[in-house]
Amino acid sequence: MAINLTALKPNVVSTDLTGYITYLYGQPKTGKTTLATQMPGALLLALEPGYHALPGVIAQDVTSWSEMRQVCRELKKPEVKEMFKSVVVDTVDIASDYCKKYICSQHGIEDLADAGYGKGYTWFKDEFNDVFRTLSQLGYAVVFIGHDKEIVSEDGKSKIIRPALNNSTRTVIAGMADVYGYAHQKEVGQMSVLTLRCSDGSIECGSRFKYLDEEIPMNYKALTEAVGRAINKEAAEHDNKFITNERITPVPKAEILDYDALMAEFQTLAGELMTKSSSNGIKITSIVERYLGKGKKASEATPDQVEMLNLIILEMRDLNK
């Protein structure tokens, strides 16, 4: 794509959640998944059981990062984009664990910290961003659902509620969010609320919209209305020029991948592609290095890297069509 800066126009902000990333974390049974699946055209990516009590929900079980990558590929298809407008990740805690395991397997390490100098978490951040920011850029509203935990502040004088992720992971995921809220009940038996701002710092939350309400009822309508009010208030500072109400566009078993079968299929596909055109050699190398690393060959893939090998095969199948 040729870059032409003279063709650029001011960004137009949508007052619904299209293209935004929302992170809802909190106590169990506070309506997080219910709120998220109230969004138009919602696809629930279920990484843990619990959606069976939600009538009408459309859910896809996800049991590995390889499957998450496959879902992302599917969501790029025009016919799939016609079906879904929102993607709900329940829970982001498990998704991040799958991503870390994938990265460790890809680089032959046991833990992200083993890479040294923070490289492991950089790889994790890049991989996680690549999947979910891509969906956001495609026009999907992305919602992360997560658990909460309570910690003691550094000075030991107060308690802080925050997501149950470790510090590095939490920083990556919270940093992606346009809206970052805590779901809870103020009193037992009361309706749940969503805290979006907290002046005393006792609850981790926030937003890119500076006029967003501090607290709202725990439902989709209240959230979209709050975002709309915040955007319109900020838009008034710019004479309302850049605002639109339109959209800018049982426990599952993990799939068992057959390493030997995938290696055999790689050889078959590589042979067919090279027979069609010798120029496919560069394309095959590019696909392999994308998943195994620069300078790596498919023949060097170990059984522990079977997820990466599967993704290589999927792309080669597309290339061979």
Task: Give names to the regions the model predicted.
Residues 2-3, 15, 30, 39, ...:
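Interfaces that engage single-stranded nucleic acids at replication/repair/recombination sites
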Residues 6-7, 12-89, 93-98, 254:
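Conserved P-loop
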Residues 42-44, 142, 179-182:
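Short, well-ordered beta-strand core segments
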Residues 73, 77, 130-133, 271:
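Surface-exposed alpha-helical segments enriched in charged/polar residues
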Residues 75-117, 230-242:
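Long, low-complexity, intrinsically disordered polar/charged segments
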Residues 94-171:
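P-loop NTPase motor core
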Residues 150-257:
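Conserved GTP-binding G-domain of TRAFAC-class P-loop NTPases and closely related GTPase folds
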